[in-house]
A protein has these predicted regions:
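Metabolite-binding pocket within alpha/beta catalytic cores that recognizes anionic/polar moieties
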Residues: 1-137
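Active-site rim beta-loop-alpha module in soluble metabolic enzymes
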Residues: 128-161
C-alpha cells in the first residue's frame, strides 16, 4: 500500500481539484468525466471511483460515494485531505410534491437531518442550509425545470412511526 494515498478512496494530495462532483453510483463517474477536458482515472477502489480533469480551465474531479451518509462522509473527509474543499452531491431521489416531475432538477437549499451521520459533525439543532453564494450561482439558468426547496434524509422508519 502507498502511504501517501487515502485509505478508502486511494487518492493522494494534489490528485483532485478543489471542486468535486459526488454521484453515488461509480458508473456515473466516467459519464460525468466525459465533460472534462483530458479526464484521467485517478483511482477505482470499492465504491469509490475518481476522475480528474479540467472544465473551463479549472481543475475538477468526480468521485463516487456509494449509498448513504457514512460512505459520503468517508469520501468527503479523505478528498478534503487531498485538497478538495467544495462538493456538489448529485443523484436521484424520490419526490412527494406533484408539481415536481420526473427529470426535473431539484436543488436543495436545506435539509432536514433525520439520519445519523451529520450528528457526528454538528448538533441536531444546527441548520443544514446551502451556501447562499453558491445557491445564487446555481439558479442563474432560470430554467422552469429547476426546483428549489428542502430535502430530507432519514433512517429507515416504519409507515406508522
Amino acid at each position: 500500500e502507498d502511504a501517501s494515498r487515502q485509505y478508502h478512496i486511494q487518492v493522494a494530495k494534489g490528485e483532485v481539484g478543489r471542486y468535486v462532483i459526488l454521484p453515488g453510483d461509480p458508473k456515473r463517474c466516467a459519464k460525468i468525466a466525459q465533460y472534462f477536458d483530458d479526464p484521467v482515472l485517478i483511482a477505482d477502489n470499492r465504491e469509490y471511483v475518481t476522475y480528474t480533469g479540467t472544465f473551463d480551465g479549472v481543475k475538477v474531479s468526480v468521485t463516487s460515494t456509494g449509498i448513504g451518509g457514512p460512505f459520503a462522509s468517508i469520501a468527503m473527509e479523505e478528498l478534503y485531505r487531498c485538497g478538495a474543499d467544495t462538493f456538489v452531491r448529485i443523484g436521484i431521489c424520490g419526490g412527494m410534491q406533484p408539481e415536481v416531475k420526473s427529470g426535473d432538477v431539484v436543488i436543495a437549499t436545506g435539509a432536514v437531518r433525520m439520519e445519523g451521520t451529520t450528528r457526528e459533525y454538528a448538533p441536531i439543532e444546527y441548520p443544514a442550509v446551502a451556501n447562499q453564494e453558491r445557491e445564487a450561482w446555481s439558479g442563474e439558468s432560470g430554467s422552469s425545470r429547476h426546483r428549489y426547496g428542502y430535502s430530507c434524509s432519514c433512517r429507515g422508519h416504519k409507515k406508522n412511526d
